[in-house]
UniProtKB/Swiss-Prot annotation:
It comes from Homo sapiens. Residues 326-340 have a biased composition (Basic and acidic residues). Transmembrane segments: none annotated. The gene is C8orf58. The lineage of its organism: Eukaryota, Metazoa, Chordata, Craniata, Vertebrata. It holds the Pfam family DUF4657. Residues 119-157, 216-298, 313-365 are annotated as: Disordered. InterPro entries: DUF4657 (IPR027958). This is Uncharacterized protein C8orf58.
């Protein structure tokens, strides 16, 4: 027993069989065959110059026919007439009053139509792409848009949306600067690339810094002498004309004389025959870690030696002044020498000083 049946009138194209088909009950399964477009109708629409519309209608009707499940559906604005063979076939299926040859002819027509439907359904997957290409060419030529298949229209809209989004993204990325494009949200690979570039730049800066540290070590003696201020001498006054051992020590420190070379003993301009009693200790080129400690100990030794010289000068009796007082220059010359603690006049051999210094070098080494 059929699920649903519907009574409707079937009209032939030539008007024949009008009385037979009126008021008959036809099963709904035959509505599938009623929606198959006639080949002559499709050819006439193409001959009119509207190829695009004809292909669109065929695709639309095929889609409606595939959706049909036995219930008759609305066809739309383009009504199609029912085939007389189908109506006779349905009448023969229900009633036994029809003749056999028209039924065979109707079955042959139905089989032919089914073959055409199968061929068109095989061609259907390639149809939307070609139709979308034709539609794009027509749209570029500024022609009015007509009927478009449903599947092709959806595909075109999706492609247009994706193209529009890609174009907007390219414009947004291109409008930004070279450093801002890496900070876009969602751009994971670009962000990682930016981080790699930053790390490489930091590594290069660290390598340059290490090279500078190697080329210019921190224990540079010239740099330490420039940064370290000399200790002020309590016995040295700028107004004194006579220059004592303090100036000799400062000169040997600034010139940086080597330990192996003998020291240059400079004779003061005020008293040329006078020489310092204590030998001048040479400066040593020591490493940067022990240089400052050795300098402090060196100054302590110098202070101790100067104190001893002052004590010895106080213990020695002063030379008697001349009775006539004809040479006041000597007294005026001796007055500024007392606070400076000038040593008494003594003679010594320079070779002995060199030997003492060598002995000290050996003891230090």
């Amino acid at each position: 027993m059929m699920g649903r049946r519907r009574a409707f009138a079937v009209d032939g194209r030539d008007g024949a069989g009008e009385g037979l088909a009126r008021g008959c009950i036809v099963p709904g399964v035959t509505s599938t065959y009623r929606r198959i477009p006639d080949a002559a109708h499709g050819c006439s629409s193409w001959e009119r110059g509207d190829k695009f519309r004809g292909v669109g209608r065929e695709a639309l009707f095929l889609k409606l026919a595939s959706r049909d499940s036995g219930v008759e559906m609305a066809v739309g604005d383009s009504p199609l007439a029912a085939l007389p063979g189908l109506s006779q076939d349905s009448l023969d299926f229900e009633s036994s009053g029809s003749s056999e040859p028209p039924a065979q002819v109707g079955r042959l027509l139905a089989s032919q139509k089914l073959g055409e439907v199968l061929e068109r359904s095989r061609r259907l997957p390639t149809a939307p792409t070609s139709l979308s290409g034709q539609h794009r060419s027509l749209r570029l030529a500024s022609k009015p848009e007509r009927e478009v298949p449903l599947g092709a229209g959806q595909q075109e809209s999706m492609e247009a949306d994706t193209d529009l989004e890609a174009g907007l993204e390219e414009e947004a990325v291109g409008g930004l600067g070279p450093g801002a494009w890496a900070c876009l949200p969602g751009q994971g690979l670009r962000y990682l690339e930016h981080l790699c570039l930053v790390l490489e730049q930091m590594a290069r800066l660290q390598q340059l810094y290490l090279q500078l540290r190697i080329q210019r070590p921190p224990g540079d003696p010239g740099e330490e002498e420039s940064t370290r201020a000399p200790l002020p001498s309590p016995l040295h006054t700028p107004g004194n004309r006579g220059q004592g051992p303090w100036e000799l020590l400062s000169q040997t420190e600034h010139t940086g004389a080597k330990a192996a070379s003998p020291p240059k003993v400079e004779v003061p301009s005020a008293n040329p025959p006078r020489l310092p009693e204590t030998p001048v200790e040479p400066t040593y080129h020591l490493p940067s870690s022990q240089g400052h400690k050795r300098d402090i100990s060196h100054w302590d030794k110098v202070k101790v030696l100067l104190n001893r010289i002052c004590r010895r000068s106080h213990h020695h009796p002063e030379p008697p002044a001349p009775p006539d007082g004809s040479d006041p220059r000597i007294e005026s010359r001796d007055l500024p020498e007392r606070p400076q603690c000038r040593p008494h006049r003594k003679t010594f051999m320079p070779s002995l000083v060199v030997k003492k210094q060598r002995a000290k070098n050996l003891s230090v080494g």
